[in-house]
C-alpha cells in the first residue's frame, strides 16, 4: 500500500492508499479510504475499498468495477446538493464547474471511441 499525497494537507479526516501494482494503461485499480483516527483497539476504520475497472470492458478476463466518471458523478451530485442548501459557496461552485468540465472531457473521449468502434477494447 502507498498513501496518496493529497492536495489537502491540514485537518484531513481520512487517508487514501493505493493497493497493488500498475495495470493495463499504467493506472492503479484498487484504493482504500480509512480514518485518520484510531479506535479503542488501536485500529483505523476502513470506510471503503474501491475497485476500478481493470482491462477493457469487452475483454473476458477484465476486472469489472468502478470507473473514474462514476466517482466524479457522485462528487457532482454532492456539490449540487450543497449548492442548493445552506452550504452554498463560491468554492463549491468553482469545484462543481471543474468536476462537470472533467466529466465533459471524459465523455468526449467515450463518444470518440464509440464513433471509431473501439470502446471496450485496448485499441488506442
From Swiss-Prot:
One of its GO terms (molecular function) is nucleotide binding. The keyword Nucleotide-binding applies. It holds the Pfam family Acb2_Tad1_hairpin. The keyword Nucleotide-binding applies. Keywords: Nucleotide-binding. 2'cADPR binds at residues 29, 53, 55, 57, 78, 82, 87, 92, 109, 113, 120, 122. Homodimer, the subunits are arranged head-to-tail. Although 2'cADPR has been crystallized with Tad1 (represented here), evidence suggests 3'cADPR is produced by ThsB2 (AC J8CSK2) and 3'cADPR activates ThsA better than 2'cADPR (AC J8G6Z1). Encoded in a prophage region of this genome. Belongs to the Tad1 family. Upon ligand binding the C-terminus changes conformation, enclosing the ligand. Blocks activity of the Thoeris antiviral defense system (ThsA and ThsB). Binds 2 molecules of 2'cADPR (2' cyclic ADP-D-ribose) per dimer, sequestering them from ThsA; sequestration prevents the signal (probably 3'cADPR in vivo rather than 2'cADPR) from activating the Thoeris antiviral defense system. This is Thoeris anti-defense 1. The lineage of its organism: Bacteria, Bacillati, Bacillota, Clostridia, Eubacteriales.
Amino acid at each position: 500500500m502507498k498513501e496518496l499525497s493529497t492536495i489537502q494537507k491540514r485537518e484531513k479526516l481520512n487517508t487514501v492508499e493505493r493497493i497493488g501494482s500498475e495495470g493495463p494503461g499504467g493506472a492503479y485499480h484498487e484504493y482504500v479510504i480509512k480514518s485518520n483516527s484510531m479506535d479503542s483497539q488501536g485500529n483505523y476504520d476502513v470506510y471503503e475499498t474501491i475497485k476500478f475497472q481493470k482491462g477493457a470492458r469487452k475483454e473476458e478476463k477484465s476486472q469489472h468495477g468502478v470507473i473514474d466518471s462514476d466517482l466524479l458523478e457522485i462528487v457532482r451530485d454532492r456539490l449540487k446538493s450543497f449548492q442548493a442548501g445552506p452550504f452554498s459557496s463560491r468554492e463549491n461552485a468553482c469545484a462543481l464547474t471543474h468536476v462537470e468540465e472533467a466529466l465533459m472531457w471524459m465523455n468526449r473521449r467515450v463518444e470518440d471511441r464509440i464513433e471509431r468502434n473501439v470502446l471496450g477494447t485496448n485499441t488506442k
